Amino acid sequence: WVSCKSKEGLPEDISFSVNYLGANITQVGLNFSRPAAQILGQYYQFIRLGFQGYKEVQYNSLTIAKYIHDEIAKMEPFVNYSEEVVNPLFIWYMKPEYAKNAKWTLYDLQDKLSQHGWMVPAYTLPSKLDDYVVMRVVVRQGFSRDMADMLLGDIKNAITELEKLDYPTPTRMAQEKNLPVEAKVFNHGCKAHKAAK
């Protein structure tokens, strides 16, 4: 183990920062060995399910991801970043013409969804694409069609609620002024970090 009393003792080139769930999170990872529990768990699952079982699990996840992707595309404010879904995950962003008149941002939608227990992150893309604020859905094993319908219903309800706003949200005003957006995330007792744009 290596412990540093302050950030000054830690070289910047071994830290990794990512804008995730509305906050800049910095991690430092030096791993020279890994526990074997995950490998043993995967080995057990492979023996239990076999190739066909894994194929069915992945196919189910991909089918549900495509369903959510298609339903998001039907919603007026959004456009999917990619036309196709080749993995059980995808991102979308707000249509530029819609965003011009909207009183809310995807950060506000993230906040509304988190109030219903959904962890759907809104974040900026890496440099040269950092004008895009996107949201991401990852469909994991066990995420059912019923859960997908619940998520889509909560997204629609949140949009309806956000559309009723009389005034722009703080994140919308900050975005218009090109100011950093104050994060609204719970991060286990640490102070909230500021998110880019």
Predicted regions and their residues:
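Short conserved micro-motifs at the rims of enzyme active sites and ligand-binding pockets
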Residues: 13-15, 101, 147-150
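Conserved PLP-binding catalytic core of the aspartate aminotransferase-like
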Residues: 78-119, 139-141, 145, 182-195
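Active-site C-terminal subdomain of aminotransferase-like
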Residues: 1-87, 93-98
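Generic non-transmembrane alpha-helical segments
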Residues: 67, 71-75, 108-118, 154-165
